[in-house]
Amino acid sequence: MVAEVILPGRPTTLKADIREKIANFYNINPDTMAKNTPLSQDDKVAKTVEQRRKDAAAHKEAYNAMPEAERRHLNSEKYANRKAEVSYKHR
């Protein structure tokens, strides 16, 4: 078991002792270890994805609320920008 390797000779080991030992080994603060776990990273990614989804939904709603002429103007600008990027890449 990992606890036996980290703290030999102890029949029971507290999680705090293990965290402190690992933190000392890697020269980091034990309190910051919990912030950098794979689960917390997954949580950050999930929050970012959710925020981007909300932003996209708000953008779509604002776009749909625009008058038709303004939408056409935006679309023509996007097309012109894409066309310029493509022609620049193929030089």
Curated annotation (Swiss-Prot):
InterPro entries cross-referenced by the UniProt entry: Ribosomal_eS24
Keyword Nuclease: no
Domain of life where this protein originates: Eukaryota
Gene Ontology terms describing biological process: translation
GO cellular component, one term: ribosome
Coiled-coil region: none
Annotated region (Disordered), positions in chain: 51-91
Sequence similarity: Belongs to the eukaryotic ribosomal protein eS24 family.
Name listed for the protein in its UniProt record: Small ribosomal subunit protein eS24
Protein species of origin: Caenorhabditis elegans
Organism placement in taxonomy: Eukaryota, Metazoa, Ecdysozoa, Nematoda, Chromadorea
